[in-house]
Structures are given as structure tokens and as C-alpha cells.
Amino acid sequence: MLTNRQLLILQVIINDFIKSAQPVGSRTLSKKDEITFSSATIRNEMADLEELGFIEKTHSSSGRVPSEKGYRYYVDHLLSPVKLTKSDLDQIHSIFKEKIFELEKTVQKSAQILSDLTNYTSIVLGPKLSENYLKQIQIIPIQPDMAVAILVTNTGHVENKTINFPTKMDLSDIEKLVNILNDRLSGVPMDELNERIFKEVVMYLRQHIKNYDNILDALRSTFHSTNHVEKLFFGGKINMLNQPEFHDITRVRSLLSLIEKEQDVLKLVQSPHTGISIKIGKENDYEEMENCSLITASYSVDQKQIGSIAIIGPTRMNYSRVVSLLQHVTSDLSKALTSLYDE
């Protein structure tokens, strides 16, 4: 159990190191307004904190820096969100000012603004397409036996699919097909489209379209491949280059390489928990992330978690500011999505 004096010194060391990226010595601490102890007392308390594993010495300086244990204690016991500025809030609110809400544009804009506001890398995990429902479908012929199906969901997501017909299709049949699909599938969840086609749509195709069985096979392969996995949106992928810890090109290269691996990124940012989650250094289970911290926050629709937002920064990241930003963005995004899904 740390004493109040040790808690204060640890907090001041971490706050100063977050701002300066420079090891903190007893002389620096003695100049802080909140530190009223003698230099000898400060040195003794720092020695105790080092022995307890909360701070550590660097090779290049006589000062001390926080250890992972120190950051963890800080995050768990000393962290308090900061009040965001009007400029911060204006930028966040700008994400949701568009009259026509399009999910992908909004999510991408969220990622970009978060990276701009933090100067770190942001990753937004979008909702699974299967959690949307079909709003409209268009089919545009591009060759006699080929067309592009444009699927629009209730969230504004647009997906293009190529349909390969076994034989040449008449334009009148394509028009009938579009009318049938929109009439029978509008409002159907995306992951149920294939099932509905073979249970309900098939009888209408049989009645109105010649060679309907060929069309059925083409639709089967088209809708079977509809993407049901989450999409990742990035902001500020190279922002880490601005951090002193990542002036080592080898370290930067390994981190950027990890970020390019979609499955690894999904494992990093998918969170089974609601609210804010903070992983520091080696807690991330990836060697490339041992000098980084990852803060994730979930967003939801009607209390159901459907996606998450993550910020990757150095272990020296400004935790208080990032947590405050994530809380505001996820809250606004959840409200916007709940309104959209309830339409």
C-alpha cells in the first residue's frame, strides 16, 4: 500500500513524463508547486517507489520513468478524465452534423478526428454488416451475362456485388428481378437474404421470369458472399512517428507491420467488455505492442454492443484525455446509431 506522499510523487512523475517524455529527477519534482517536501525526502520516496517497481531508471539519465506497474497503478487508482475544450467538443459534434447519416462515412470520420485530437493511431471497428438490414437493391447490367448488384442497407452502407448469369439476360427480366427482390427483401436482415430468396422469392421468380433457375443459382453465389465480418477504419496510422519513443525505425516498422494484419488488429480491438478498457505494454500480448498502450471503448445500439473504438499510443500516452475523448465519441455514436436503427 502506497502512502499519500508516494501516491502524489508517483502521480506527478507520470504526469510530467507524459508531457515531456523526459526522465524525471528529484530536482524537477522539488520545483513542482504541489510537492512541498525536502529534496532528501523526495529522493527517499523515489528510491522506495523504484524498489517497489513503480518507477525505473533509464540508462541515459539519472532521472526516473514510470514502469508498466506504475502506469497500471496510475490508470487503476489515480486516473480522472479531463474536461474537454470547446474546440474538442466542436470537432466531435461535427462528426454527426451531416443531414444524411451514412454509417461508413461517420465511422471513418470518427477515426480521423480521434487521431487528429490525440496525435495517436485510432482504429474503429464497425458493426457487422449482418446486423444491418437491406433497404434497397439495384441491378445494373454491364455485359449481356453480367451485372452489378448494388445493395444499400438501413445504415447507408453500400455493397457492390457482381452477378454472373449463365445466359444472356433480357433487360425486362432484370427489371422484374429488381422489383421482386425489393418487394420481398426490403427490411430483411443481411444475413437472412439467402434463406429468404430460397423460401419466398423463388416462387415469384418462377411465376414471372423465364429460366428462373439459372437466376437463382446466380443469386445464391452473390448473396452467399455478402460480407458479414466487421470492417476496420483507421486514422493516423503513421502518427506514432511523431512520438519520441518511436524514432527507432525498427520499432516503428514492426508496429506498422502489425497494424497491417487485419486479423491481429481485430484481436486487439475486439472487446467483450462494455465501457473503457486499458491495456498497457506487454498486457497486449503482442511483442510489437510492448512499448504501446491500447485504450478501447465500445459503442452500442439499444444497450447491445455492436462495435468498438481503439486508440494506440505510447505507454506514455495522455490517458486522461484519451479516455474523455473516447467517452464522448462512443456516447454520441451510440445515440446516432440507436436513432438510425430504430427508424
Curated annotation (Swiss-Prot):
GO terms for molecular function: DNA binding. This is Heat-inducible transcription repressor HrcA. Keywords: Repressor, Stress response, Transcription, Transcription regulation. SUPFAM superfamilies: GAF domain-like (SSF55781), Winged helix' DNA-binding domain (SSF46785). It comes from Bacillus subtilis (strain 168). Negative regulator of class I heat shock genes (grpE-dnaK-dnaJ and groELS operons). Prevents heat-shock induction of these operons. Pfam families: HrcA. InterPro entries: GAF-like_dom_sf, HrcA, HrcA_C, WH-like_DNA-bd_sf, WH_DNA-bd_sf, WHTH_transcript_rep_HrcA_IDD. Signal peptide: none annotated. It comes from the Bacteria. Belongs to the HrcA family. GO terms for biological process: negative regulation of DNA-templated transcription. PANTHER family: HEAT-INDUCIBLE TRANSCRIPTION REPRESSOR HRCA.
